[in-house]
């Protein structure tokens, strides 16, 4: 489970959120919706403790921001899969090697690497592209490689920051479907996006950063409708 307890989040001494109280349950699908610069990336970074609260506490799968040491942060991040908007793939290595690299760095037994890599690629429909170079793939395919890379280490949660930001509408829907498929296997998936209309067609628990507030509801109606409740004051 992930929990924010009276947490204040700042970036470069600029207040972003105040008195944030929020729980994310194991296996949950959660959207965080907000415009560029609204604070959603800060919120996502705090999940893997790249951003630490200046007050209060964040607890991520048993690791507390108050007590965790730098060495333990690396251990925590191994339990999480991170999906970036800009792919960050190694262009001089094949799709297979991009995933295998993650496993080698984390000390996975050599005998298990091929099976884990191919299983992850199969989850995103790219087992046929294992030998391809990333730059030879479409944008949507590259993002699917990024998702497979996040998945290959058997994470308890996947954190995706604008995973559809550089993609056309049809490909964006396809990427969300792959993330939902992963979530259906019991893996928590937290998605940050600026695209409210895209999320509307994929109902789930949603946080929206709107009018300098973080509000929450199941997204089945417009954000001006009933059912939204404050979660924290956002000062972005």
Place the predicted regions along the sequence by residue:
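Conserved ABC transporter NBD signature motif
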Residues: 56-65
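Conserved signature/switch motifs of ABC ATPase nucleotide-binding domains
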Residues: 132-135, 153-154, 185
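Catalytic Walker B motif of ABC-type/P-loop ATPase nucleotide-binding domains
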Residues: 158-161
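Helix-to-loop junction immediately C-terminal to a conserved catalytic motif
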Residues: 48
């Amino acid at each position: 489970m992930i929990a924010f307890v009276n947490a204040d989040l700042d970036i470069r001494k600029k207040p972003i959120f105040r008195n944030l109280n929020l729980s994310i349950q194991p296996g949950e699908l959660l959207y965080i919706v907000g415009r560029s610069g609204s604070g959603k990336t800060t919120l996502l970074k705090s999940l893997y403790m790249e951003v630490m609260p200046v007050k209060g506490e964040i607890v991520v799968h048993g690791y507390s921001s108050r007590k965790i040491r730098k060495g333990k942060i690396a251990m925590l991040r191994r339990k999480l899969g991170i999906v970036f908007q800009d792919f960050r793939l190694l262009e001089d290595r094949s799709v297979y090697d991009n995933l295998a690299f993650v496993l080698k760095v984390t000390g996975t037994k050599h005998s298990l690497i091929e099976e884990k890599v191919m299983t992850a690629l199969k989850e995103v429909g790219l087992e046929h592209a294992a030998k391809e170079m990333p730059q030879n793939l479409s944008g949507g395919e590259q993002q699917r490689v990024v998702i497979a890379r996040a998945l290959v280490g058997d994470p308890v949660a996947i954190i995706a920051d604008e995973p559809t930001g550089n993609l056309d509408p049809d490909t964006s829907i396809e990427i969300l479907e792959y993330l939902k498929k992963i979530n259906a296997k019991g893996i928590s998936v937290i998605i940050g996006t600026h695209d409210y209309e895209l999320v509307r067609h994929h109902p789930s628990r949603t946080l929206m950063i709107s009018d300098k507030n973080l509000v929450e509801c199941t997204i089945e109606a417009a954000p001006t409708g009933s059912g939204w409740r404050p979660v924290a004051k956002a000062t972005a």
